Regions:
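Acidic/aromatic-lined carbohydrate-recognition and catalytic surfaces
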Residues: 385-435, 525-530
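Active-site-proximal substrate-binding groove within the catalytic cores of carbohydrate-active enzymes
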Residues: 21, 36, 54, 519-715, ...
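Polysaccharide-binding surfaces and accessory modules of carbohydrate-active proteins
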Residues: 2-269, 701-713
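Catalytic domains of carbohydrate-active enzymes, especially glycoside hydrolases
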Residues: 361-384
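Conserved, mostly hydrophobic/aromatic
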Residues: 131, 302, 346, 377, ...
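Hydrophobic faces of well-ordered beta-strands that scaffold small-molecule active sites
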Residues: 344-348, 379, 422-426, 489-491, ...
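Active-site-adjacent "subsite" loops/lids of carbohydrate-active enzymes
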Residues: 341-343, 354-357, 400-401, 428-479, ...
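Short Pro-Gly-centered flexible turn/kink motifs
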Residues: 297-316, 731-740
Length: 743
């Protein structure tokens, strides 16, 4: 237990962005975030008449080797410094459409000062929070191993027996696999832990590794009451290491005797307490930590540290909570006129040229892409390499002469002549061992350990803190944009450096965090110089799809998955943490596909930001017309999807689902767009839950493919939403897109 409530507490109340937050503090305890509610009457609000005790979890947890925890565990609650913080001041302000609450706390013995800043954008029911740590002058330096960006017992303490943790496991070509686990059994089992007067040592924990922020799991999660649906959701806004956990917080005020009251007592206390009805729970969300990521910093009079940002919200359902985080991401994005136009991009890589572009293969593909309506044509990996081994030669970014006898500029001119913006693939953060840059750049330009450059799969990794590294990249980008007229870059990131770099850093993980932040600063500077340049975020598929990168960049590749039958689960799952208008879902039709398979892969692209590929130059007129129709539909719906909240009528998808479905609830519109994919092993029909439609009448129109293409699907309005019937007794896969209009 971190804090035992005292009889007298003082509240701090803050309303912002449509949420109502309540904090408590007392003379003998730190500030605690005890309630997060929606507006009056909102389903996100705590049920009226709740008799639970206030959560005891401190607002800030700070783990230091000099102070440790008040109990023995490997959790990120119960830190001695967190328990010892006391309120100094709280200030609420508002400016530029952003409400701001600043809470300052101080730990007297160490001189630690923790300043927590919470911000909410007007009209967006979500809060972004960071905490800055410093040590007051005259106090000894303080080593820190971990500090929370968000820590609270609100929502999750309402009914710990009913709380499930939701998260999405991820991996190369298998991203966004959403799953849940109960906090108690099978999550944490009852172990009579109070027999020794100790809090639980266990927790449900999710974390990332290295610089692939979504390489192991997505940097977003939720805690949901499976009985009421009430959900607390969060996202880590960082392009590197992070962790979050959900754990128990026993209530010592009822039915139990703390360890300190047992010591030297003449009275036997017998077995552990049986009353756990007032136990609570907590959520802790962090950036990198010492135990997980080799991160630590030492605070002194000259050195402060600010945590990675975390945004959080609460809603009456998981869908609504994820939707409110989507609204937060949408409101926080860097404005970008060219990117916000949402042009249709054709990329020559996936199931097409596979990193082997040549003038002879590109020219007919360019013409075919223009015919179906593409607005950007991106030449992917290999354009700079004169051999077949493009992997280890990255880093110089000079056009190949062997691949383009007429010169790369002539190919880019052909793209422009067909009315499209030319684009190129770049992997800016790496330098291949066979490149000239590997020999000419100084060692200080690279991430390193013990004075040795880190090598991963025949590549070095640049350290974006280095002026030499940034100058190298600036020269390449400016040359390609100003000299060749490139208007789109696909930015890839296929290797990682492990825990980080110890060059000019207090710890390996701290060096990596500084590099991560320097990368974001460099990307901002690129767009400052080239405001019309569109940048796609691709990290070996979607291994770095986080809110920090997507605040700056315009588009995100959602996977490297090449099997069209496996992609829908990835595409729909991505919408749990990526905006539809940024979710670049690949569609890659092939000359040998039948109509249903062309429609299937194109529907995947339509479920977000259509990212077109495929050997279009080998398709007949009928096949090209099917693709062109999908592009036409996307152009007609892309701005609606960019104003929509994704909903999941058959639940967040699992890898082996027979049916995968998604609905786009368009703001300020009677329209909802529904896309459904049926696998070969599925039943012919499926029921979709669409409670946001209400019980009124609605018209349903199939928008893709056109009537008469493929099997005759039917869509019927039901009291719960919609019933789809594929009408196909053959068991073949299929997909359709519908518009449901209320009224």
């Amino acid at each position: 237990v971190t804090v035992i409530d005292t009889a007298v507490t003082t509240p701090i109340r803050w309303e912002a962005g449509g949420l109502r937050l309540a904090f408590e503090h007392d003379p003998d305890g730190p500030v605690r975030l005890v309630a997060i509610d929606g507006p009056e009457g909102d389903a996100a609000s705590e049920p009226a008449g709740s008799a639970r005790s206030a959560p005891r979890q401190p607002l800030v947890e700070v783990l230091s080797p000099a102070w440790g925890r008040v109990n023995n565990s490997y959790r990120y609650d119960g830190t001695a410094l967190g328990a010892g913080l006391r309120l100094v001041d709280s200030t609420a302000t508002s400016a530029g459409g952003v409400d701001r609450l600043e809470i300052v706390q101080r730990h007297e013995a160490s001189g630690l000062v923790a300043t927590t800043v919470l911000e909410a954008i007007a009209g967006v029911p979500a809060v972004r929070t960071t905490t800055t740590l410093r040590v007051e002058p005259g106090h000894a330096p303080l080593s820190v191993w971990a500090v929370t960006s968000l820590a609270t017992g609100a929502v999750v303490s309402d009914a710990p027996n009913d709380v499930d943790l939701w998260w999405a496991d991820s991996g190369w070509c298998s991203e966004n696999r959403w799953t849940s686990r109960a906090l108690r059994s099978p999550g944490l089992v009852a172990v009579d832990r109070t027999a020794r007067g100790e809090t639980s040592r266990n927790r449900l924990a999710i974390s990332s590794l290295s610089t692939w922020s979504s390489g192991v799991a997505n940097p977003a999660g939720a805690a949901r009451d499976r009985r009421t649906g009430r959900t607390l959701a969060w996202q880590v806004e960082h392009n590197g290491a992070w962790a979050f956990e959900l754990g128990e917080d026993p209530d010592w005020g009822h039915g139990g005797v703390p360890l300190e009251d047992r010591l030297f007592s003449e009275t036997p206390f017998g077995p552990p307490r049986a009353d756990r009805s007032r136990d609570g729970a907590y959520v802790a969300v962090l950036g990198p930590t010492d135990a997980l990521h080799q991160w630590s910093v030492t605070l002194d009079g000259d050195t402060a540290f600010t945590t990675v940002p975390v945004s959080f919200t609460v809603a009456g359902s998981l869908d609504d909570a994820l939707g409110r985080l989507a609204a937060q991401r949408r409101a926080s994005r860097r404005p970008h006129a060219a990117g916000d136009a949402l042009p249709v991009v054709f990329n020559d890589y996936m199931n097409t040229l596979e990193g082997d572009p040549t003038e002879g293969k590109l020219l007919p593909l360019i013409d075919a892409a223009a015919r179906v309506g593409a607005e950007v044509f991106c030449i992917d990996a290999g354009w700079y390499d004169d051999t077949a081994g493009w992997w280890a030669s990255v880093g110089d970014w000079q056009p190949s002469t062997a691949r383009f006898p007429s010169g790369l500029p002539a190919v880019l001119d052909r793209i422009r002549a067909q009315g499209m913006v030319p684009g190129l693939w770049l992997e800016p953060e790496v330098v291949g061992l066979e490149s000239r840059a590997a020999r000419t750049l100084p060692d200080s330009a690279f991430l390193q350990r013990g004075g040795v450059r880190i090598v991963e799969n025949a590549r070095y990794l640049l350290d974006l803190r280095s002026p030499d590294a940034r100058a190298h990249l600036d020269e390449a980008v400016d040359r390609l944009v100003d000299g060749l007229g490139v208007g789109f870059f696909k930015l890839d990131y296929n290797v990682t450096p492990g825990s980080g770099t110890d060059l000019d850093a207090p710890s390996v993980g701290a060096g990596l965090l500084e590099h991560n932040r320097a990368l974001l600063t460099w990307l901002e500077a690129v767009l400052d110089r080239h405001p019309d340049l569109i940048l796609e975020n691709c990290g070996s598929g979607a291994m770095r799809s986080d809110a920090a990168m997507l605040r700056v960049l315009q588009m995100q590749s959602t996977s490297d998955q090449q099997d069209p039958l496996l992609y829908p689960m990835i595409a729909v799952g991505a919408l749990g943490h990526i905006l539809p208008e940024q979710a670049g879902n690949w569609a890659y039709p092939q000359p040998d596909m039948d109509d249903e398979m062309v429609v299937f892969t194109e529907c995947t692209g339509l479920a977000g930001r259509l990212y077109q590929a495929g050997v279009l130059s080998g398709m007949d007129d009928h096949g090209l017309d099917l693709v062109a129709d999908a592009v036409r539909v996307h152009k007609g719906t892309r701005y609606a999807l960019a104003a929509s909240t994704p909903r999941f009528p058959t639940g967040l998808p699992s890898w082996d689902d027979a049916w995968t479905t998604v609905a786009f609830d368009v703001a300020d519109s009677p329209d909802t767009y529904v896309i459904a994919w049926r696998q070969a092993h599925a039943e012919a029909a499926v029921d979709l839950a669409l409670p946001h439609l209400g019980g009124g009448d609605a018209t349903v129109e199939q928008v893709y493919p056109a009537a008469g293409v493929g099997a005759g699907w039917t869509a019927t309005r039901t009291a719960e939403g919609l019933r789809l019937d594929s009408g196909d007794g053959t068991g073949a896969p299929g997909a359709r897109m519908y518009r449901v209009r209320v009224g």
